[in-house]
Amino acid sequence: DGANDTIHFYYRNDTLAAENNLASLDGKVSVVVNGQTCPMTYDAANDRFGYDLTGVSTGDYYYYYVVDGTGELDAFNSEKADYSGKECSVCHFKKANMSVAASLSQYAMDYNDNNVLSVKLTAKDGEGLETSEIAAITADLSELGLNREFAIDPTLMEGTISCLNTVAAGEKTIPVTVKDIYGNVYTTATNVTVTERKKSAGDFDWDEAVIYFAVTDRFFDGDASNNDAYGVGDYNTGEKGGSSYHGGDFAGLNQKLDYLKDLGVNTIWITPIVENITEDQHDNKTDTATYGYHGYWASDFTKLNKHLGTEQQFKALLDAAHSKGMKIMVDVVLNHAGYGTEKYFNSILTDADGNSISMIRDSNNTISGDDKYDSLSDLPDFVTENKAVTDQLVTWQTEWMSKYSIDYYRVDTVKHVETTTWAAFKNSLTKVNPDFKMIGEYSGAGYANNAGELGTGTMDALLDFDFNDFAQNFVTGNISSVENSLQKRNNAINNTSVMGSFLSSHDEDTLQYKLVNESKISEEEAYNLMKVAATLQITAKGQPVLYYGEEIGQGGANNWPLQTNRRDFDWTELEKQKADSNSIYNHYKTMLAIRNAYTDVFARGNRSTVAVSDADGYEVISRSYGNNTLYVGMNVKEAEKEVVIPVAESAGTVLKNLYDGKTYTVSADRNVSVTIPAAKDGGTIVLTAETKTEPAPDEKQDDKKTDTAESNGNAQSSGNNANQSTSANKTTPKQEEQAVAEVTVQEESFANVIEAVNKAKTGSKIRVNLLKTTKIPANVFESIKGKDMNVTFKVSDQASWIINGKD
């Protein structure tokens, strides 16, 4: 107890304690410290003997217990030494004269940022503390809405922090506490300014990411000149080519960005980009050549894989994606290298004396079967517990991010690397770009088991390995139990600790394949149920992660080396599905349009059950955030389902189905009768309140269908009208007549609107006539924000929106 210059000694005989007879030793127990006998007192409340040695100073203390005349060493202290000819247990006490300071890499942050909190210990005089003498460093992040005891690794002396999106702007204090192994406590604090998040047009938050995972080599061949880039014959799209290169590349991704944008995704996850081994890892059983087309068998972390393209093509992909408001997520590996690369990687590092540092694990530092200290699939395993090795791996991956302005990383094999490495990696990336995020692949992770990788300064999200099981169970009839789990999951997720919801991946049988081969249903039924599974995924909290080809009903088995779950994307099939209004492709496109239009509801909203029946194969849930509530219905049966559900809206309110455009009116008892289509027809409804059937007494007119604007400038003009309203008030032409300044928007340029707003005086009213568009860009709202004025956007002769700058 360093704070009180005290050492507390305790003794208990477990056998006597189990017999409730420890008190029989009262008066017979003492501790001998540095030769001095000290009687111990029985503590009935804790059923143990204790003695406090006070007034201690820095030094070593040798002790043993005497129990009923017999000496005993401390059974829980392995350190022992001789003192005056007597074997003793040993403890150490140190009172360091230290000061502690804390600082941040950024003085200000918003809820989408990360920030590196650094701690520095300085000896005022005399001896300081070694890293091994620091027991714990914690930061109180409660003013940022997070953990009161955020742990910082003493070997790093810094950790990456974040902020909940519910925290109000303003200056926040972060107290920091350092405890040493001697019980001394050192405290300090630092401040950070939380600012309002300002999103430019087309920007989105981390928890609003809609991710599309493309195995780059299998997506689209945009440059045939790199198909046999190394001249070793590793390009083969034939029957035996399941584990060879197929030609997909950066140029192909670039050419298909418009397809992905139109589909509704905003983030593209691509497989690792670095150079991979060129040697054939032949499978003799099937006589099949296998190569590193997937990117996970790195041979050089400083070069691009030539099969994927040049540095210019990679930069062009990133630039083009960014110009379209999309982000690129690159898959990275820090756990292992490709087969046969031991000699190369062991030749890279040397210590201060010029001695080689082995980057690859050998028999001397392998623990057989251990997740972290053994190799995965016999791949060369990096010795990441060695700081020099970690530093090199972190440097390589940070340089790629910095050089090309990569937006996000998907981190492979998180389970197989120490948390200290991931913390160091996150710190390095955050210092370059506070907005940079990582989603980790921790095999088996889910909302109830994040393995300590969320909210701890390492990963910003984890891939949810539970979700495809949830989806499989849901569409095969176990609806209520899955809903139970999804509501718990909903409560566990926030913008700093996100889960990526995937149905299929490159490492597993696809969900559609499992429905046929595990759940034993027909191909046609599996295809239909994938629509319902997609609705479950897209409307759930967390980041939807689409696996390429899933949106056109493509799937297969994780059957190496054939890898039918990694087929080339079928662009011919896509064109067929575009022409079929009831195709799974059009289902995905519709649902993603709804997701993007109501992104705050789906990314952050509450989830509640409205109605559910396992026997009848349906459920209706509500997703609500702020003033918006959506009702999502799903039906896994082959026939449509008529359902009466209670709603929060008042009688007469018209609910519109964003999925097919149909409307339903709330009854006097605040119920609504809806039809959920059969699974083959999408099995989906998404209801939102549109209008009331009876106007207010002073408004003798019929409400008409209206379009709405979206505050982030990303309203979707889909056939389903999946557009989200801002927190504005719907008005009538009678109210609009008070406007004193009028601006007309002919096309989609709002420059004259912004100019009028900037020139307007306090208390002004402006009317904007929208002739050909109902999409209002974010910078228009930014120009209005904070100003004392009303701006009315007239969307039709019957309805308008009033935006108050102070609201």
What is the role of each PLM region?
Residues 45-52, 153-161:
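Aromatic sugar-binding surface patches on proteins
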Residues 203-209, 217-404, 422-433, 437, ...:
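Substrate-binding/active-site clefts of carbohydrate-active enzymes
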